[in-house]
Amino acid sequence: MANMLVASSSKTLPTTTTTTITPKPKFPLLKTPLLKLSPPQLPPLKHLNLSVLKSAAITATPLTLSFLLPYPSLAEEIEKASLFDFNLTLPIIMAEFLFLMFALDKIYYTPLGDFMDKRDASIKEQLSGVKDTSSEVKQLEEQANAVMRAARAEISAALNKMKKETQLEVEAKLAEGRKKIEVELQEALGSLEQQKEDTIKSLDSQISALSDDIVKKVLPVS
């Protein structure tokens, strides 16, 4: 019976084909020595004193402030630059004043001076043409002096009037320019004050956050 089972099993088993497997070359592995890093030896937390931790947090806070706060010289330069950054109001007013004086000189003062020179020349010609009589010469001289005095008084009055008018106009324009500059100064100071408050608030929040982080890192977690 056993022989029959062996014969039947030998008949039913399929023929297996032998496959040749080529061996893969094996390269030797290089063994690099591993560096063993020893953790820093910290003192046990039970030996730390609370006063030491507080002093460490206090000394660390100015260091963080020194890195966060800008240099005072740079802040002063920025503030000066923002305070004195004005428009061209005053130079424009001065240019208008100079242009007005130039126009008055060309339109009014120069023709008036030429007219007075011609009048003086004509009076001198009349005086030279008069006969050498004492009475007539005295009368003509008195008339000429009176005319000259009247002309000079008229010219001085006109000049004073024009100077007052131009001075009032220039003062009004200067006052307007000063008002504009004061408004701009107030706006600039307000914006600087707001920026200062915002910076202080942000620095306070950063300082509190940094101090909390330092305390959390140094103090033991309960």
UniProtKB/Swiss-Prot annotation:
InterPro entries: ATP_synth_b, ATP_synth_b/b'su_bac/chlpt, ATP_synthase_B_chain. One of its GO terms (cellular component) is proton-transporting ATP synthase complex. The chain crosses the membrane at residues 83-103. One of its GO terms (biological process) is proton motive force-driven ATP synthesis. It is a single-pass membrane protein. Disulfide bonds: none annotated. CDD domains: ATP-synt_Fo_b. One of its GO terms (molecular function) is ATP binding. Keywords: ATP-binding, CF(0), Chloroplast, Hydrogen ion transport, Ion transport, Membrane, Nucleotide-binding, Plastid, Thylakoid, Transit peptide, Transmembrane, Transmembrane helix, Transport. Residues 1-75 form a transit peptide. Pfam families: ATP-synt_B. It is found in: Plastid, Chloroplast thylakoid membrane. It comes from the Eukaryota. Belongs to the ATPase B chain family. F(1)F(0) ATP synthase produces ATP from ADP in the presence of a proton or sodium gradient. F-type ATPases consist of two structural domains, F(1) containing the extramembraneous catalytic core and F(0) containing the membrane proton channel, linked together by a central stalk and a peripheral stalk. During catalysis, ATP synthesis in the catalytic domain of F(1) is coupled via a rotary mechanism of the central stalk subunits to proton translocation. F-type ATPases have 2 components, F(1) - the catalytic core - and F(0) - the membrane proton channel. F(1) has five subunits: alpha(3), beta(3), gamma(1), delta(1), epsilon(1). F(0) has four main subunits: a(1), b(1), b'(1) and c(10-14). The alpha and beta chains form an alternating ring which encloses part of the gamma chain. F(1) is attached to F(0) by a central stalk formed by the gamma and epsilon chains, while a peripheral stalk is formed by the delta, b and b' chains. In plastids the F-type ATPase is also known as CF(1)CF(0). This is ATP synthase subunit b', chloroplastic.
